[in-house]
């Protein structure tokens, strides 16, 4: 197949598996609705400096990630595609970086293509590409900073070296504006030991200053602007989002230190069967500069994230590009040698996983059906399992010819699985679809009320309003609600009837509740019985009409 044909086929696959599904399912709570609403508020209100969630100060992240999601909504509309396109673009650019870095390291087109394809089809990378959060963007900036570092170190001229270090600084600056100080730390974790090993520490000190200057030029305008606007921003952001998450006893998402070790194997499905051979080859080539650089990039950030108390699966996404390159390099070496053992093992692993998933689905359907009168969704999930099994079987039977079969498994999974979710999951996790069904009833509401931040942000995004009052909930908006001018934005349970009576004299109220517990049912019971009510799964929408004093 010619290069032009390969590129055309990959572009078609990108459109079919990555772009088309973006509009086929609602926004998942809590992340997608949160980021959609924050960026929409920037777009509508014009405040590009201070992030606000539901109109309240929200200082958990800087602003660049919101800017990119807002840009997507500005260009493509305030819709599902517009909210998610930033993640797809960031992922596509990271795939391109994988290709370019592999080409620079090994100067072999086949290896470059294999590395890019593996990275694009890693389960964690592909799955996050259609999900509106900040991790794909942050991962791209970290990837760009370290690719720029290698280009600077491998440059043949002073001009190219200056360009590489400058690009490194710009990428660190944008990464900082996306997710914070980690964007500076991760490149240092790799650059410092690598350049000490190469005995190039003077170069690190000299050119590193240029990278720091470039990063400051990117960061300082916003950093000073937000400090002038919100004097408490940096205190909260540094201590709450960095120190507390890393070392605090009450850190969010606390996990054991080994949490990421098995997760790393899961993250690179459907290629996990190649991990042992790739790591073994990396060990044999441990004195080669490219392998040392990639190993440091993989292992040191992984060790840092493992030491942190707070852990989420997506935190290790910056570690996956070097892993894809090590695996792609080992894969092509085995293809050239005609060694099919690792490929057969990977195919057998995927086939076994597909059969296990099929058996689990059959068991659940017989004992406690996951899908109830949902033949289309059940068909889609069977199609996903079938594609995974077919890819595994093909790679097991014809490992040297069908080595790329897992691509199909991964891409069918990300394209179809969101649409294959059971109705009870969709109803519970994508409340914006329920809101969209009742826009006519909601449009005239004077007040909005919700007992759940995910549902509240879905309501705000669909209605293009930030003024949702919180019903007996605070969550991650505890800090924003602590400001005196916003204390009325949250109504405790004891005051709800009085608040409803006063608010209804001013106009109608739309109340969106998620009912997941006895306390939620009690919240529902406290609402007046008049007006209209609509229910979908565990979501209840009540339209309470205006009353006269």
UniProtKB/Swiss-Prot annotation:
GO terms for biological process: lipid A biosynthetic process; lipopolysaccharide biosynthetic process; protein O-linked glycosylation; response to iron(III) ion. It is an enzyme of class 2 (transferase). Its EC number is 2.4.2.43. GO terms for molecular function: 4-amino-4-deoxy-L-arabinose transferase activity; mannosyltransferase activity; pentosyltransferase activity. It is found in: Cell inner membrane. The chain crosses the membrane at residues 9-29, 80-100, 112-132, 136-156, 176-196, 204-224, 256-276, 288-308, 312-332, 346-366, 376-396, 402-422. It catalyses: 4-amino-4-deoxy-alpha-L-arabinopyranosyl di-trans,octa-cis-undecaprenyl phosphate + lipid IVA = lipid IIA + di-trans,octa-cis-undecaprenyl phosphate. Pathway: Lipopolysaccharide metabolism; 4-amino-4-deoxy-beta-L-arabinose-lipid A biosynthesis. It is a multi-pass membrane protein. Keywords: Cell inner membrane, Cell membrane, Glycosyltransferase, Lipid A biosynthesis, Lipid biosynthesis, Lipid metabolism, Lipopolysaccharide biosynthesis, Membrane, Transferase, Transmembrane, Transmembrane helix. GO terms for cellular component: plasma membrane. Its main location: membrane. NCBIfam families: PRK13279.1. Catalyzes the transfer of the L-Ara4N moiety of the glycolipid undecaprenyl phosphate-alpha-L-Ara4N to lipid A. The modified arabinose is attached to lipid A and is required for resistance to polymyxin and cationic antimicrobial peptides. Belongs to the glycosyltransferase 83 family. This is Undecaprenyl phosphate-alpha-4-amino-4-deoxy-L-arabinose arabinosyl transferase.
């Amino acid at each position: 197949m010619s290069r032009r044909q390969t590129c055309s086929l990959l572009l078609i696959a990108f459109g079919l598996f990555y772009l088309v599904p973006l509009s086929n399912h609602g926004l998942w709570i809590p992340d997608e609705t949160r980021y959609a609403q924050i960026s929409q508020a920037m777009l509508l209100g014009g405040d590009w400096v201070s992030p606000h969630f539901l109109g309240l100060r929200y200082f958990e992240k800087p602003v660049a990630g919101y800017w990119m999601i807002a840009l997507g909504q500005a260009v493509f509309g305030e819709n599902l595609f517009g909210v998610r396109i930033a993640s797809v673009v960031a992922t596509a650019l990271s795939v391109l970086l994988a290709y370019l870095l592999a080409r620079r390291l090994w100067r072999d087109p086949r290896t470059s293509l294999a590395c890019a394809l593996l990275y694009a089809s890693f389960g964690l990378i592909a799955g996050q590409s259609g999900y509106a959060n900040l991790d794909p963007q942050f991962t791209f900036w970290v990837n760009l900073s370290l690719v720029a570092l290698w280009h600077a170190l491998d440059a043949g001229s002073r001009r190219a070296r200056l360009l590489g270090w400058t690009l490194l600084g710009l990428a660190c600056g944008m990464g900082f504006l996306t997710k914070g100080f980690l964007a500076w730390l991760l490149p240092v974790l790799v650059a410092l030991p690598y350049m000490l090993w190469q005995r190039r520490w003077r170069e690190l000190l000299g050119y590193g200053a240029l990278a720091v200057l470039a990063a400051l030029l990117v960061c300082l305008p916003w950093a000073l602007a937000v400090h002038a606007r919100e004097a408490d921003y940096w205190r909260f952001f540094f201590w709450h989002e960095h120190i507390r998450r890393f070392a605090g006893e009450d850190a969010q998402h606390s996990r054991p230190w080994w949490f990421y070790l098995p997760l790393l194997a899961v993250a690179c499905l459907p290629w996990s069967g190649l991990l042992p051979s790739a790591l073994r080859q990396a060990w044999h080539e441990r004195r080669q500069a490219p392998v040392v650089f990639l190993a440091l990039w993989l292992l040191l950030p992984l060790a840092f994230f493992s030491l942190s108390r707070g852990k989420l699966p997506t935190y290790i996404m910056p570690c996956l590009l070097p892993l894809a390159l090590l695996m792609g390099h080992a894969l092509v070496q085995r293809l050239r040698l005609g060694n099919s053992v690792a490929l057969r093992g990977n195919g057998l692993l995927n086939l076994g996983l597909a059969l296990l998933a099929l058996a689990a689905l059959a068991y659940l359907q017989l004992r406690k059906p996951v899908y109830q009168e949902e033949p289309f969704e059940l068909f889609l999930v069977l199609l996903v399992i079938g594609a995974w099994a077919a890819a595994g079987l093909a790679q097991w039977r014809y490992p040297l010819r069908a080595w790329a079969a897992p691509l199909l498994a991964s891409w069918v999974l990300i394209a179809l699985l969101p649409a294959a979710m059971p109705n009870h999951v969709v109803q519970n996790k994508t409340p914006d679809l329920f809101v969209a069904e009742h826009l006519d009833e909601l449009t005239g509401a004077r007040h909005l009320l919700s007992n759940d931040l995910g549902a509240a942000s879905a309501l705000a995004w669909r209605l293009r309003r930030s003024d949702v009052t919180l019903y007996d909930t605070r969550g991650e908006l505890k800090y924003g609600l602590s400001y005196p001018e916003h204390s009325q934005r949250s109504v405790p349970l004891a005051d709800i009837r009085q608040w409803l009576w006063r608010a209804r004299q001013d106009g109608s109220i739309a109340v969106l509740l998620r009912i997941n517990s006895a306390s939620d049912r009690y919240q529902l019971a406290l609402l007046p019985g008049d007006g209209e009510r609509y229910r979908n799964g565990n979501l209840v929408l009540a339209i309470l009409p205006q009353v006269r004093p």
